[in-house]
Amino acid sequence: MLLEMDKIKITVDSKIGNVVTISYNLEKITIDVTPKKKKEKDVLLAQSVAVEEAKDVKVEEKNIIDIEDDDDMDVESA
């Protein structure tokens, strides 16, 4: 016989993980959750974005020019 007080509502955000088991008694509630695996497409997309960002950094580094002020070069000797 279930009483109205015995009802327990448990909500787990499915974006975080998958519920494996839910067990409870009057003293405690235990929820075992496994992390969700990323989809292979999402992982590949993240890797390609990281590679593109790395390429952008290298291009920016190549465009840096060090200018040294050498006064001896500007003076002509007669």
Curated annotation (Swiss-Prot):
It is found in: Host cytoplasm. Plays a role in the inhibition of host protein synthesis. Specifically, inhibits the initiation of cap-dependent and cap-independent translation. In turn, affects the outcome of infection by decreasing recruitment of inflammatory leukocytes and reducing the memory CD8+ T-cell response. It comes from the Viruses. Belongs to the orthopoxvirus OPG173 protein family. One of its GO terms (biological process) is symbiont-mediated suppression of host translation. Coiled coil: none annotated. Induction: Expressed in the early phase of the viral replicative cycle. GO terms for cellular component: host cell cytoplasm. This is Protein OPG173. The lineage of its organism: Viruses, Varidnaviria, Bamfordvirae, Nucleocytoviricota, Pokkesviricetes. The keyword DNA-binding does not apply.
